[in-house]
Amino acid sequence: MTKYIFVTGGVVSSLGKGITAASLGRLLKNRGLNVTIQKFDPYINVDPGTMSPYQHGEVFVTDDGAETDLDLGHYERFIDINLNKYSNVTTGKIYSSVLQKERRGEYLGGTVQVIPHITNEIKERVFRAGRETNADVVITEIGGTVGDIESLPFLEAIRQIKSDIGRDNVMYIHCTLIPYLKAAGEMKTKPTQHSVKELRSLGIQPNIIVVRTEMPVSQDMKDKLALFCDIDPKAVIEAADADTLYAVPLSLQEQNMDQIVCDHLKLDNAPADMTEWKALVDKVRNLSKKTRIALVGKYVELQDAYISVVEALRHAGYTFDTDVEVKWVNAEHVTAENVKELVGDTDGILVPGGFGDRGVEGKIVAIQYARENKVPFLGICLGMQLASIEFARNVLGLEGANSSEINPDTPYAIIDLLPEQKDVEDLGGTLRLGLYPCKLTPETNAYRAYNEPVVYERHRHRYEFNNQFRQEMENAGFIFSGTSPDGRLVEIVELQDHPWFVAAQFHPELVSRPNRPQPLFRDFVQASITNKESK
C-alpha cells in the first residue's frame, strides 16, 4: 500500500517547506523506499510559465515539458529523481480539468461544487502521482499558508484522504515559525500554537511539527508546543538556519524525523545510510579554493529567478574543491564604458535564459567582453542566442543583427521563430518544452564535456538560430558543436579561438545534482578556475 505524507505551512510563507519535504524524501529514499514528491500551488494560473520571475522565481522544466514551481528543482536535486507533469498541480489545472469534464457531460447533469468535485479531482492528482511512479511513499507539499482562502480545497482534500485510506497510510507534517524577538530577548511559540489551532479547525491534526528558528529551541519549549498542539514532544523538530541547504537532511535524521515517519506509517525499513551525503556536506563546508563568476541577468534583484543556475555552479565547484561566488550584474547597467569595471574582477561570465528586450544590449556587451578578452563564458538559452547575435554584429559586421523577438524589423534576424511557432497565439504552454536529443560534434568543447555522441537536455524556448547565417558564421570561426539529430536545429555553439566559450539553447542547469554536476557547468567552472590561476 502506498503511503502519503502531506507537508503544510503556517504563520508565514517561504519557511522552507520545500527543503523539508525534499530532505525527508532523501532520508526515505536512503532507507530503500521508492519516493515521489509533488507540489500543490493554490494560485489560479494553470502553471507558472507566463508568470514574472519577480512574482514566482524560476520556472523549473521537467523531462516531459511541464513548467513548474522552483521547489521541484529542490526535490530533484535532493532526492535525485526526475519528476513529471504530475508533480506540480495548481488550482488552475484542477478547475480547468473539472470544467472540461462538466462540458463533456461527465457529471451527469449534477451541480458541480467544490465538494466533492474539486476535492475529488485534487485527491485523484495525489493518487495518480503514486500510480504513475509505482511509489512506496508520496510526499505532497501544499503551497501557501494555512488560513489562506486559496488553500482550503486542498486542505479539505488531504483531510479526506485519511478517511479514505486509513490513518496508518497518511501523515501530516506542519512547518511553522518560532520568531525571536530581539527587544524582549525571547522566542515566541504563540504563532505556532495559533497556526496548529487553525489547521485542527479544518480537521487536520499534525503528526509532526517542524519549527523554523534562528535560535536553538529548548526542550521546555518543545514540551510546551507538544502539550498545546497535542503531539509527542519528540515530534517537534527543530529546523534551525543551516550553513548549507544540504545539511538539512542530516539535521532531520539526527532528530529521528525519518524514524518517526516510518513508525507512524508502519514501515520497517532499515535506517538510512547517509555516509555519502555526510561526505558531501563535509566537502561543502571545507572548500579550500574560491572562484568568482559574473552572472549577467535582468532579474538579479530576485536570486530565486536563477536558483538552479546558482546551484549548478556550486555543484561544479564542489568537484574542484572550490567555492563558487556569484557576482550579480544587472544587465541593464552594463555598457561598453563600464563593462570592465563590472565583470573584469571575475573569472568567468555566465548569461542565463530570459525573455523580452530589457537588458539585452548589456548582455551582448558582456558577451563581447568575454569573447575579446578570452574570459570563460557559458550562455544559456537567450544567452546562446545573444552570443550568436554578438558574433554576427562584431565579427561578421552585420550591423543591426538581432533576434526577431527583440526587433521584428531587424535586417539580419540571426534568431527567428521556430517554423511551427509562426501561427501560435497562446503564450502559455506553447514553447518548445522538455527533453530533446542533441547530437554533438567530435573534438569540440561540448563533446569533451559530455564524452557522448548524443545527449538529452531540457528546453524552454520559442525562438531558434536562423540557419540562413550558419555557413557564413561557421566560416568565420563560429562552431556549431551541437544540433538536433537531423541537423536542423542549433543546440550548442562555441568559438574556435577561445579557451572556453560555449553557449547552449537548452537549460543544462535543470539536471545538475550536488554529487553529479552537469558537464557544461563542470567544464565552465574548471575553465574559470584555470583562468584565475593564470592571471
UniProtKB/Swiss-Prot annotation:
Q: Which residues bind Mg(2+)?
A: D71, E141
What are the recorded GO MF terms, alphabetically? ATP binding; CTP synthase activity; glutaminase activity; identical protein binding; metal ion binding
State the pathway, as annotated in the record: Pyrimidine metabolism; CTP biosynthesis via de novo pathway; CTP from UDP: step 2/2
Residues annotated as binding ATP: S14, L15, G16, K17, G18, I19, D71
- Tell me the first and last residues of the signal peptide: none
- What Gene Ontology cellular component terms go with this record? cytosol
Keyword Iron appears in the UniProt entry: no
Alphabetically list the UniProt keywords: ATP-binding, Glutamine amidotransferase, Ligase, Magnesium, Metal-binding, Nucleotide-binding, Pyrimidine biosynthesis
Any additional notes?
CTPSs have evolved a hybrid strategy for distinguishing between UTP and CTP. The overlapping regions of the product feedback inhibitory and substrate sites recognize a common feature in both compounds, the triphosphate moiety. To differentiate isosteric substrate and product pyrimidine rings, an additional pocket far from the expected kinase/ligase catalytic site, specifically recognizes the cytosine and ribose portions of the product inhibitor.
This chain belongs to which protein, by name? CTP synthase
- Species of origin reads Bacillus cytotoxicus (strain DSM 22905 / CIP 110041 / 391-98 / NVH 391-98)
- The UniProt gene name for this protein comes to pyrG
